[in-house]
Amino acid sequence: MSRYLRYTLLTLLWVAVAAYIVFAASAVRRVRRTGTVGRLEIEVVDSSSQGHLVSAAMVRQWISHAGIKTLGTAVDAVDLTGIERLIARNGFVDKTVAYVSYGGTLHIEISQRKPLVRLLTDGMNAYVTADGYVFAAPRASSLYVPVVTGSYRPPFPASYVGSVREHIDLRLGEIDERIAELEREKYPLYRREMENDRNISALRRMRIKRQWWRLEGSREFDARVDALREKKAGLRRTYRYRAGVIREEIERIAGLQEAERRKQKKLEKSYEDYMKLLTFVETVEDDDFWRSEVVQITAKTTPSGALEVELTPRSGRFAVLFGRLEDVERKFDKLLRFYRSGLSSIGWSEYRTIDIRYNDQVVCKK
């Protein structure tokens, strides 16, 4: 085959492909202009054995209540973006995709978030994912995850939905802006302080010279010196008082800034404890024995602001005072050794509390 013929055939092939693409696109546009939605298929792509937070029936209800038309609607008129936004408004929905197939079926694919734990603490009723995303527990949800109860106060309001890290960063940014605003309040005070310092320096340079050209006598000169001394003493008192007032105001503002910085540290510590709690729940869930043994996790915020945990085990009638979420593996190892060498021989109903908060100690109370 000659080179010319080969190039000609190749060109015709590409022309045919381009023509097919144009024809197919035209056909799709024609179908979208004239076709209607005949079916609605909703799929929750990651339903698991734990249960579900969202169902096809719930999605149908949302779409119906929102007044978004689907079945019998022209394909081009279906508000796909509106459907996606409507579904995504629910915090327990991670991702959603809506599209209409060539055959006129409206497909809605939904990926739900995977909660790690449910918080039922201090007026809170929310699910939390392993990365700290929080969302309200939906009605009629049936998801089996560990539950944390108690008086623990998480670092976000009960109505919050979203990434807790983003919430913390927003709060920290607001505090930073408040600190900067307070710093700007100091600027006029700094200028007044510098002006006052210049006045004090000028006061020190004030002198009286004898006016020889006027043949000034000693008595007149002494009188002028006394008057200057009195004037300087009065100005000195004024400038010192003014310096004290300015410095006091600067220190007051600095105190407010320090209080804001303490808020930041407290907020960061609260977030750190929050993530430690999630890691703790993961540790329990990842261990076959403790996942079965730990029936309930009770968390509380101490007067100092620290997070402490108490466990209700399946075995016995006692509570395990776990304390702060530090050295978690060491504490669990210590508790397991006590289970095997202590309670197995003493009895599982002998104690009311088992305290493992202290290093190398297990303190039991009847």
Predicted regions and their residues:
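Charged, solvent-exposed interaction patches on well-folded alpha/beta domains
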Residues: M1-D46, H52, S64-K366
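Generic alpha-helical secondary structure signal
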Residues: V54, M58-W62
